[in-house]
From Swiss-Prot:
An example Gene Ontology CC term for this record: cytoplasm
Gene Ontology BP annotations: chaperone cofactor-dependent protein refolding
Gene assigned in the entry: groES
Protein's name in the database: Co-chaperonin GroES
Family membership: Belongs to the GroES chaperonin family.
Chain's role: Together with the chaperonin GroEL, plays an essential role in assisting protein folding. The GroEL-GroES system forms a nano-cage that allows encapsulation of the non-native substrate proteins and provides a physical environment optimized to promote and accelerate protein folding. GroES binds to the apical surface of the GroEL ring, thereby capping the opening of the GroEL channel.
Length: 96
């Protein structure tokens, strides 16, 4: 992937959603909602404060995160659908 996010942006790949419910019902792709979880593939250097100091991001590559359904901008890179969003749009990091 030749994509490097700027400032406080991150690049996220959505995680695959279960295609079957707990009771065994198979959900077709057309009816399935896009998952609101993903894995961070790249992070920007951070955001500068008013004094010009660079504040690094709290998230890192490999983190599994939760974000809003409409957060970020979807882009296609090398056939993969990725999301570019600001760190502020990330709601939580999923602890392993």
């Amino acid at each position: 992937m030749n994509l490097r996010p700027l400032h406080d942006r991150v690049i996220i790949k959505r995680l695959d959603q279960e295609s079957k419910t707990a009771s065994g019902i198979i959900i077709p792709d057309a009816a399935a909602e896009k998952p609101d979880q993903g894995e961070i593939l790249a992070v920007g250097p951070g955001k500068r404060d008013e004094a010009g100091k660079l504040n690094p991001l709290d998230v890192k590559v490999g983190d599994r995160v939760l974000f809003g359904k409409y957060a970020g901008q979807t882009v296609k890179v090398d056939g993969d659908e990725l999301i570019v969003m600001r760190e502020d749009d990330i709601m939580a990091v999923v602890q392993k």
